Amino acid sequence: MNEKVNSMPRSKKPSYPLDALQVMEVVWQDAEEVGDIGWNNIKDALKSAKKPCPIMHSIGYVINLTESHIALLSTIGPNVCSTLEKIPRGWILRETIIRDGETLEDHREQQKRER
């Protein structure tokens, strides 16, 4: 069922200050803790131990890129944001740039210099 979505013609989109931020999808293998509080069945633990760790997909505004991790925010405003998601580089399977741009850290530094 691959139907094309027809969109109405729209006027030119206005630009916003945070349009300069890079947006990225990160596919990564997460760590996992399996079991409940208290004692757990050893057979269930052995069965779960053989299963691969879950593959996760995160999309967000790139806040910072370091040698050790990528930091993303899913939502950002002028002075508030969602929770920060830090993904260790060793867990990352794929990075896809959805919108090229700068990190929030670089963006804020540039704004300070321009003032």
Please report, for each region that a protein language model flagged, where it lies by residue:
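Conserved RNA-binding domains used in RNP assembly and mRNA/RNA metabolism
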Residues: N2-R115
